[in-house]
Amino acid sequence: MAGGEKRRGLSKSCALLIVIAGIERYAFKGVASNLVTYLTDVVKMSNSRAATTVNTWSGFTFMLPLFSAPFADSYWDRFFTILASSSLYFVGLVGLTFTAFAGSRSTTKTISLYFLYTSLSLVALGLGVLNPSLQAFGADQLDYDLDHDNDHEPSSENKEVKSNRKTQFFQWWYFGVCAGSLLGVTVMAYIQDTFGWVIGFAIPTASMLLLIFLFLCGCGVYVYADPDLKAKPFQRILEIIKERVCGRNKITLVNDHDLNAMELELQDQKPLCNCSNTEANTTTKSLPDDHKSCKTGFSGLETVKLLLRLLPIWTMLLMFAVIFQQPATFFTKQGMTMKRNIGPNFKIPPATLQSTITLSIILLMPFYDKILIPIAKKLTKNEKGISVKERMGIGMFLSIIAIVIAALVERKRLKISKMMKTTPNLDPVSILWLLPQYILLGISDIFTVVGMQEFFYSEVPVSMRTMGFALYTSVFGVGSFVSAALISIIETYTSSRGGKHNWFADDMSEARLDNYYWLLAFTSAISFLMYIVICKHFKSRSDDDDQCDTNC
């Protein structure tokens, strides 16, 4: 920057992409947070089928980045990937709005399940490609800022400045996502309950159109990766596997220092620029063929190792994702049976309680940054206060406490319902009793979800950044499938013993969601203990960097 002036805040491109991410969350939460109510009340699905449908749809939505990321990292231009996927997202929302409109105009009040599933699939496909590409594109803007702003930094301060700016970016990104989620859950749930589903789905559709417009408005401020220098990590992986199988290329991995050097070489391979980088392009093209071949095989093997070593921690995070499926499904169904009146004329829409998760994040994030982290820095002598792995572990523990509280509240609700013999699906227990479990999930979100984003961002090569974000979202995708499978297995087993034993009975006075919550708490506790053991033996790349700095 001119005169060596150092910019403290985020660039215009980063800020614009954070706003765009917030709008996307507003549209998504406006549909997803109350979808189970739409499926049970309008489409007339059973509780278990509606929950399974929502979980399966969420699973596809969060799993698709795993399949799109290799193409986005190796072949697709991120700008046009974002534009195409957001357009597909918009078309899906248009279709969903049409299903609500057709249902409201039909004399039989029936909705075509085929058209409904097609619309939801288009939304899932668009979102599955959009989210990791948008985050990776934002990280590209951040890298450009760091590379240029830190040219004037002393080398001893460079690492700490970069670390703090990365943390700032992820926290502001998550703040934008939370703000959009909060508006989507509160405003849209009220509109859907009060004015109907046509308007309730039309507003998120209009929001996606606004997102596309704003994204195009930023063309002049974005920085782009040079397409001639775009790394193709997955192509290298396939090449090295082919060479290994055919026995045509024998590669020897030397030591950890060589691996670190190769990773630095990979990072320098993909500059970000506002124009073509002729010098860098010439340098890359002038590399000898033997060197290119060696680098291709070498980095391919190391990339496979980097991905496989993340698998144990990725697996242990799945039960956290299963717990996080509950607010949009069974927590909402719980709230529909409870006393929701505030005054004589207003009823709390059950889906709006999901906003307390987001409110908890927004209100407590400053406490986390300004009070908790400085205290932790003094106690641990760590520049971040607590490590990313510790941050994720704390959130996992809090999510277990939240689901235990949910089980206790549900058991109390059932007990009061049976004692007072109330009307089915209408209990005198206030819906506000559900607040503690929502708030605790919000606090756990601050620790685990932000920690997951930073963890997978930091542990993959820069040329596979979209894949890093895809690994983060895939935790929730597979977690959704696990949740759907659990519901199907439990319902099959419990319903075979008679209607009164069905944990997911449509009559909430007969359902045993408390038993389901206890099962989730038990399995999550086992997963948490295994996570602790795995983390003790896991050596992160940041640890390697710290050791390298010490040796130097």
UniProtKB/Swiss-Prot annotation:
Subcellular location: Membrane
Signal peptide positions on this chain: none
Top-level taxon: Eukaryota
Tissue distribution of the protein: Expressed in shoots, roots, stems, leaves and flowers.
An individual GO BP term: response to nematode
Regions crossing the membrane: 16-36, 51-71, 82-102, 110-130, 169-189, 195-215, 311-331, 356-376, 390-410, 431-451, 470-490, 515-535
Residues where Phosphothreonine is found: T81
Topological relation to the membrane, as annotated: Multi-pass membrane protein
Major localisation: membrane
Induction of the gene: Down-regulated upon nematode infection.
CDD domains given in the database record: MFS_NPF5 (cd17417)
Family the entry assigns: Belongs to the major facilitator superfamily. Proton-dependent oligopeptide transporter (POT/PTR) (TC 2.A.17) family.
Name of the protein in its database record: Protein NRT1/ PTR FAMILY 5.8
Species of origin: Arabidopsis thaliana (Mouse-ear cress)
